[in-house]
């Protein structure tokens, strides 16, 4: 007979109900005559109610403008009747600070819950059992299980090996005894580790600065090449610096790092090193856009810009005569790894 499927329904926190004056995340389910019925997302979707009088501090002109079915948002807990399971909530009493803190907590809890649920399903254990033995103890010890999971990424044993649970066994003499055993088996540890590292390993961000670099002196291109090398030499193992030509005289400096502030500081130092080197040969560096974190969209726009500039340069080169081609402006394309420093 096949094993029954594990129960994957469970609240996120040990307490079955939220505390009064606590901000919680809800989703609106239905709108009735007196108020809106909602699900408390962090408490296994138990039902709560927001009276229309608790929607806004101002005079209500349109209910639909204040609350809509399907909307997810933070609200404040007014009353909790644990015996009857009634929870009264307020939208008008939750402050901006409460909203921000609630959203941050909920986003962390949602990720933890997703990992817990996936592990429970993978190993075939009830989700609540996993929370009792692992999840909620981590909340108690670390303030939030999310913080514990961040440690698991690099040091899983320090988190999991400290967790224990009690089991009752009957000895040879028929007497029931309680034993303390590890809460996390090797199978569970492997499942957690795989899922946590996949979802929570921080991805390096890209930091970029845009500059103009010129040198009209004799061997100007070589001086630019040396200045670029000085800039790249500032890079470190966790903040390597690369400088790339967009189209003369435009260049971009980039680094990939887990530490945004350190990446910005490193690029600024690289720019300073480049300025010092190029000014020794009467060249000039102008910062067009300072060091900042960039997105994939920014990279796509840069690639499109580079392609357009290269195409424009090729068209201009085709229109110019051979005499113009021999002229050295000191701003030619630089191959920092090549011998001559000039891309033919």
Curated annotation (Swiss-Prot):
Compositionally biased region (Acidic residues): 314-336
Q: What GO MF terms are annotated? A: RNA binding; translation initiation factor activity
S1 motif domain ranges (all copies): 21-92
Q: From the record, give the cysteines joined by S-S bonds.
A: none
UniProt-listed Gene3D superfamilies: EIF_2_alpha, Nucleic acid-binding proteins, Translation initiation factor 2, subunit 1, domain 2
Q: What does this protein do?
A: Functions in the early steps of protein synthesis by forming a ternary complex with GTP and initiator tRNA. This complex binds to a 40S ribosomal subunit, followed by mRNA binding to form a 43S pre-initiation complex. Junction of the 60S ribosomal subunit to form the 80S initiation complex is preceded by hydrolysis of the GTP bound to eIF-2 and release of an eIF-2-GDP binary complex. In order for eIF-2 to recycle and catalyze another round of initiation, the GDP bound to eIF-2 must exchange with GTP by way of a reaction catalyzed by eIF2B.
What's the protein here called? Eukaryotic translation initiation factor 2 subunit alpha
- Organism of origin is Arabidopsis thaliana (Mouse-ear cress)
